[in-house]
């Protein structure tokens, strides 16, 4: 646990040590102290702040990834600057991001403690050597579990208007920021409209979209309510909001809305995929990529049953082979592809 705030360190340590399968073996106020302690006992996961004295978190992260690749979870503030620096950290090899405890400690323990524990567990399973190679080349009250049905409106039963416009729906989680960068930067300007759910806290997705927009030939933006899904543009679900695909005549739009977490996530891949099955049917391509858990597995199956082409990322190129594995297990994927083949599959949708 590396953070220059003693208060933050103590809060995070208490949360993680309360989990039966997690032990915090050391804390440090800066990366230089962390290096000394890690030489004595190397951790399975590092939780890292990005703005610290003596050595910043990004420099430390790059050092770790080049010398001894280890899963790193970034713990960042909900500020514009914090979001930008966090994107740099994810690009440098961090596997996930969580938000720092703010003044409302009780609110953090209620809303974010479980997310922190789940993120650290997920990071421990990450194939970080593959990620490094790519970079260099318990709740306070009973949990209520929801399915995408609580977000999706009731089906009207009316036949969909005919359209030939193709869309692509992508869902991903741990390791997904790097995977999305690899896929989207490989796309030409002429490609189908894309809608994306990447599990990420609110405030960070706008910076993520802006970074991709500067790297890609296609346009990339954080989705806003009623944005049209257009060829040559990717819309990324805002953190903390669900993203649905809608049809109006022969055009597709997105709806951004509140609602309870689905499969413990908001945004949820299942919500996007199931809405795509209903709105686009056989005109859609569904892609599920690296991530822990089963979010998106049910939705990908529904897309396939609606006539869509569906793809799961293979185990060899996944940082965490959880979500794709579950989708394959349930029969939702009609193809299993390496990450490097995803862009070609998207372009094929135009044909």
UniProtKB/Swiss-Prot annotation:
Modified residues (4-aspartylphosphate): 49
Active site: 173, 199, 295
Reactions mediated catalytically: [protein]-L-glutamate 5-O-methyl ester + H2O = L-glutamyl-[protein] + methanol + H(+); L-glutaminyl-[protein] + H2O = L-glutamyl-[protein] + NH4(+)
One GO CC term, this protein: cytoplasm
Predominant localisation class: cytoplasm
Keywords, ordered alphabetically: Chemotaxis, Cytoplasm, Hydrolase, Phosphoprotein
Any single biological process term in GO: chemotaxis
Gene name as annotated: cheB1
Record CDD domains: CheB_Rec, REC_CheB-like
Residue span, Response regulatory domain: 1-115
InterPro entries: CheB-like, CheB_C, CheY-like_superfamily, Sig_transdc_resp-reg_Me-estase, Sig_transdc_resp-reg_receiver
GO molecular function: phosphorelay response regulator activity; protein-glutamate methylesterase activity; protein-glutamine glutaminase activity
NCBIfam families found in the cross-reference section: PRK00742.1, PRK12555.1
Subcellular location per the Swiss-Prot or TrEMBL entry: Cytoplasm
Family to which the UniProt record says this protein belongs: Belongs to the CheB family.
Post-translational modification, as annotated: Phosphorylated by CheA. Phosphorylation of the N-terminal regulatory domain activates the methylesterase activity.
Known function: Involved in chemotaxis. Part of a chemotaxis signal transduction system that modulates chemotaxis in response to various stimuli. Catalyzes the demethylation of specific methylglutamate residues introduced into the chemoreceptors (methyl-accepting chemotaxis proteins or MCP) by CheR. Also mediates the irreversible deamidation of specific glutamine residues to glutamic acid.
Enzyme class: hydrolase
Entries under PANTHER family matching the protein: PROTEIN-GLUTAMATE METHYLESTERASE/PROTEIN-GLUTAMINE GLUTAMINASE, PROTEIN-GLUTAMATE METHYLESTERASE_PROTEIN-GLUTAMINE GLUTAMINASE
Domain notes: Contains a C-terminal catalytic domain, and an N-terminal region which modulates catalytic activity.
UniProt protein name: Protein-glutamate methylesterase/protein-glutamine glutaminase 1
PROSITE patterns per the UniProt record, alphabetical: CHEB, RESPONSE_REGULATORY
Alphabetical list of Pfam families matching this protein: CheB_methylest, Response_reg
EC number(s) from the headed UniProt entry: 3.1.1.61, 3.5.1.44
Location of the CheB-type methylesterase domain: 161-351
